[in-house]
Amino acid sequence: VDNILPWFALKSIPGIGDLLYKRLIDRFNSPKLVFEATRENLVEVEGITPRLAVAIKKPKIGDSVKKDLDLVRRKRYKIVTMTDTEYPPLLLQIPDPPPFLYVLGRLNGSIKNIAVVGSRNATRYGISTTRRLCHDLVKFKMTIASGMAVGIDSAAHEG
């Protein structure tokens, strides 16, 4: 789990969305090497401003990163990063793929998948319905994918 800390830490920096994340990985190959890069090398990446380079050089491991790591440990999720061979190749073809996926079970390109995305401020009804729906979909051998955000996304994996 500790080797994913740099992945989570980079994702937690304000201003680093999926597009910039991919550009950084394309340039430096891993978050660890991103953090080791000089400010000068960082600003060579399209979209990285001097201010953002400073933020990258001084990351703050906040509560959200600690909560994500705790969730991975408790639920025993496997984290598949965009540099892993298991990462779905089609996802890498979009401009802003998620840098990593939370996986329960195994990834298989021939399995039917459904993505669940929703509000972080979901109602009880929304969370309950999402859990029931996803529970039923799994019975039909569907793979549930989400960003694992609080709310509907995480409820999808609780069903």
Located regions from the model:
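Short, positively charged patches
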Residues: 1-139
